[in-house]
Amino acid sequence: KIAIQDASPKNVDLEFRKSLFKLIAGDLRVSSHFRVEDEYLQSSYEGGPIENFLSDKKVDLILRFSATQDLNSASANVKLINARTGTTTSERSYVLNDKKRYPFLAHKIVSEANDQIGAPSIKWMEQSVLFARYTEAKKSEIVLSDYTLTYQKVMVTGGLNIFPKWGNEEQSAFYYTSYNGAEPT
């Protein structure tokens, strides 16, 4: 069983912190490698005897994050703590240059925590999803998203744009079919 503790500074937007908590908890559940303590727990980043063991919650691991954001970026320091011994088993820092993409921060944190315990890979969570969304008759847009659809960015508008497909493994290019007249292009 794993507990998630928010150790973010109090001046960081509470809605952002709780949203990150929910994404991390959801990702841990989706992985099916963890039983997740549902309670939103807060702690200092260093923790103390109570926060580092959580004996009343009967957990084996604690994932503690301290998230910050500024005008453009979002970052998090993360510790994975063995709740039986109170020792930190791993500690990492993550930075995203576009804070709107913060769901990918949660996905990366969970993917690496999953790797730390030696469970089968869930790296697919870190990848982007590309899909077509109809907006009205003969109109659609191509949207880039995370797998939870929490983050969405419209990439192509105008006309009927369908069948998006990644053009490479790095997900830096994509193809799609566009019906802007009688013929597909």
Task: Give a label for each model feature.
Residues 3-6, 23, 27, 35-37, ...:
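Soluble periplasmic/extracytoplasmic beta-strand elements of cell-envelope proteins
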Residues 23-34, 57, 108, 112-120:
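Structured segments of extracytoplasmic/periplasmic soluble domains
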Residues 49-109:
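Amphipathic beta-strand/beta-sheet edge segments enriched in Tyr/Trp
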Residues 66, 129-136, 168, 174-181:
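Beta-strand C-termini and the immediately following turn/loop, strongest in propeller blades
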Residues 71-77, 136-144, 182-185:
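Structural motif
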Residues 122, 159-177:
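Conserved beta-propeller blade repeats
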